[in-house]
């Protein structure tokens, strides 16, 4: 959580103090990208309070930076991008090099039954 706020501050946001409470049904360490989801939720909450970028890809990069540089996990960007841009009932098409992302609805995916 602190790493996500630090990452936003590194982006130039005038971050101040905050009290933050997180709740989740996702078990920690379950392999369901819970750390990426927490980082993204924290970046969004801090951004809403203190300002910062609005581009979802930029916000995902800030969350990834927290995981890489503060937590010490050399993760890629996929989990953070999924947390930032996915919507229920859709599949995410993501180019992790360019961060180009597109969503397709279940109805548009003939293979998704």
Q: What positions do the PLM features span?
A:
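Anion-binding (especially nucleotide phosphate/pyrophosphate-binding) glycine-rich loop
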Residues: 1-62
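ATP-dependent small-molecule kinase catalytic core of the GHMP/sugar-kinase superfamily
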Residues: 51-113
């Amino acid at each position: 959580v602190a790493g996500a706020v630090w990452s936003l501050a590194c982006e130039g946001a005038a971050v101040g103090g905050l009290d933050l409470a997180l709740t989740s049904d996702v078990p920690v360490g379950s392999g369901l990208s819970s750390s990426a989801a927490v980082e993204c939720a924290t970046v969004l909450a801090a951004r809403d309070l203190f300002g910062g970028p609005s581009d979802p890809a930029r916000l995902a990069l800030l969350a990834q930076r927290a995981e890489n540089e503060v937590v010490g996990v050399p993760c890629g960007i996929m989990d953070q991008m999924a947390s930032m841009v996915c919507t229920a009932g859709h599949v995410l098409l993501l180019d992790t090099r360019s961060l180009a992302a597109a969503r397709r609805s279940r109805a548009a995916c003939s293979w998704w039954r």
